[in-house]
Amino acid sequence: MPSGMFSIDNILAARPRCKESVLLPQNGPVVFSSLGESLYGPADYSGFYNRAVAPTSTLQGVNGSRLGFNNYYYGQLHVQTHLGPSCCGTVQALGTQQCSCVPPATAYDGAGSVLMPPVPHQMLPYMNVGTLSRTELQLLNQLHCRRKRRHRTIFTDEQLEALENLFQETKYPDVGTREQLARRVHLREEKVEVWFKNRRAKWRRQKRSSSEESENAQKWNKSSKNSAEKADEQVKSDLDSDS
């Protein structure tokens, strides 16, 4: 065996380079407004990735495409196989804990691939994929699934009065009527439609509650009447027995 095989350079070169990380772009995230756009083309990735880990142009991502999913990066970053052995391996998919709103990630192209779940784009410039554990990737995936808090619309007294007046006229106004009212009270037609849906639900609850109260009152009156009749009969029977 040649002595050169045991030189310091060869020994160091043969050591696993597992700590080599896949660095995400430092100049900002790559996001898209639609799912149909490709993440990168054959020659435009050099500005987004380090030259050593730039993905090849023929690489297919998750489900055949590299996509921006709801302004979140979703795809695969590939490390060239000559940079390190297979001990670095593949970051496993999130499995059953992956949220249902994200397409299943099943495409792998070998041990050199690193699967990246959806990550908030604000975090992309600071992410070092190679140092993330499975649990951390799952937490990042859960961040994507959190629902945004809905803002409650606050109506003015004038708007509420106009809405209530129209509701007293009709419980189901058509689109034209809603648009006319929306222009008059400076609201969007969608807000007027939602208000009427909620108001009809409240009206039905009130109607159901009043109906139940009426039934209970009728039952109470009937029970009271029966009790009074029984009392009269008892008094009458007592008088008959005394005579």
UniProtKB/Swiss-Prot annotation:
SUPFAM superfamilies on file: Homeodomain-like
Gene Ontology annotations for the cellular component aspect, listed alphabetically: nucleus
Induction trigger: Induced by activin (even in the absence of protein synthesis), lithium chloride, nodal/nr-1, nodal2/nr-2 and derriere. Not affected by basic fibroblast growth factor, and repressed by retinoic acid, and by UV light.
Chief subcellular location: nucleus
Protein purpose: Plays a central role in executing Spemann's organizer phenomenon (the dorsal blastopore lip of the early Xenopus laevis gastrula can organize a complete secondary body axis when transplanted to another embryo).
GO-annotated biological processes: regulation of transcription by RNA polymerase II
Name this polypeptide is given: Homeobox protein goosecoid isoform A
Compositional bias annotation for Basic and acidic residues: 227-243
DNA-binding region(s) in UniProt: 148-207
Sequence ranges of Polar residues compositional bias: 217-226
Expressing tissues: At the start of gastrulation, it is found in a patch of cells encompassing 60 degrees of arc on the dorsal marginal zone.
Localization per Swiss-Prot or TrEMBL: Nucleus
